[in-house]
Amino acid sequence: MRQPASRFCLGLGLALSALTALAPGPVPTQAPKTAKREALPPAREIIDRHIKEIGGREAILAQTSTHAVGTVSMPAAGLTGKLEAFHAKPNKFLQRMTLPAIGEIEEGFDGTVGWSISSLTGPILVDGKQLEQRRFDADFFEELKAPERYESISTVERTTFEGRPAYKIKLVKKGGEEDIEFYDVETGLKAGSVSTRESPMGAILGTTVFSDYQKFGVLRQPTTMKVNLMSQQMIMSIVKLEYGTVDPAVFTVPPQIKALIK
């Protein structure tokens, strides 16, 4: 699950692994409200404005890796823990989260092998549709929305997302799967996304809200991400983000995962 929406690859999968460990509790969510119809800007124009607002295409393409450090909390359960994420081009990532009562959860993709390890499940080798989704989500330059990765990208409507005017965009991937993204009308920045990702429990629909954009180096990134799924909420906050400092060895597949590869 990554929500695939930021360069440090904090996705739905990591949140799902933690949230499924707790009993569900109601989380109020603010559903998008449809506004009156009007002439809509092309989706490509909306996406390109976001790219410009966070630093520009050239600045994004100049990066080779990111290392993010932050905190993660689950308000309904009263839990707060640590978060760390590594991401490198073209499509490698490692995410690590530690929470009281749940322990450490790791997810990774080395460009070929997808895996997860937690104290709850032990080592798991990701395959099938989950692996396909992880490969897609791991794209280091996902923010650019390269046309060749999609069947179509279109503006659906102007609506309200988290209390603010937003453009709703539908992204249809090769193969037919769809993601929805929301872009703030006033700031041009990506405000959130709605996506479905496969899990051991089946397909899970999740909503991610991006906020508190801050500049790290030459690029702006959202420092707060609220993930809502399965009637639970997880809040991830980034306090430090570095570019170009990741050792490639960090993406090495762990021994306990290698033991599962046939």
What residue spans do the PLM features occupy?
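N-terminal secretory signal peptides that target proteins for export/translocation
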Residues: 1-6
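Bacterial N-terminal signal peptides
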Residues: 9-21
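Signal peptide processing junction and immediate N-terminal pro/mature segment
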Residues: 21-32
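Gly/Pro-enriched, hydrophobic low-complexity segments
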Residues: 29, 98-100, 162-257
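N-terminal low-complexity, Pro/Thr/Ser-rich intrinsically disordered segments
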Residues: 32-49
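N-terminal mature ectodomain segment of secretory-pathway/periplasmic proteins
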Residues: 44-122, 148-160, 173
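Acidic/charged, solvent-exposed loop-and-adjacent secondary-structure segments enriched in E/D, K/R, S/T
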Residues: 115-142
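Short, conserved active-site entrance elements at the starts or edges of catalytic domains
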Residues: 133-168, 189-192
